[in-house]
Amino acid sequence: MNWNRKPLRALTLTVAVLLPMSSAAQADLPDAPGTVSTPKAAPEPTGPTIVIDTTMGRLTCKTFIRQAPIAVSNFIGLAEGTKEWSLDQGKTKQRGKRFYDGLLFHRVIPGFMIQGGDPAGDGTGGPGYYFDDEVDPNLTFSVPGRLAMANSGPNTNGSQFYITQVPVPQLDGKYTIFGQCDAHSVDVVTAIANVERNASDRPLTPVRIEHVTIVREGQPMPPDPNPPAAPAAMPAAAH
């Protein structure tokens, strides 16, 4: 497969899709439904927990292993170095190296999302392969903290991912959601999304993934290298 990737870009909420920077085409928003149906209950994440320690704090996301088994397995394999990948169109295969450690969040948009997982650091990179979308109609962008695959069109998932800061229903049905991050993680996403950035939404001060840990059922959470500061104690009342 030719691996001349176009940038995977997160546009503003008026477009609300992740599209190649060079593409003039824009995905249409869905039409209003003609009938109202009762949606099924949203599924709960039941898979391993992804812990992403960044230079601005920890992101903790439980995975939807039943709804997105390919995406979850792909992320875990890259994170732990058990999955083969390539940066030169498959000429040189790599395995045993942790893919995500050290990569940047190369694109951040306040009030929308943060995007990372690109070894090129500019939205054009990936692991040297694609895999298909896994879209569950009952798993939507109705809440903050969704962990999803970025893409440049249908079935072009690789290594790039994003985490939403707010609900973004405009993305429903277009991207593979494979995790849900907790409330503290959404606070970290908000902090990252609001850093100073250039015209391409790239942080002026790099925000880096320091380490990714996969926590399976029964395993303890790793120590947080940068735990949140404890609230200041209230001064004692004067007598």
Residue ranges with predicted function:
Residues 2-9, 22-239:
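Cyclophilin-like peptidyl-prolyl cis-trans isomerases
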Residues 11-21:
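Bacterial N-terminal signal peptides
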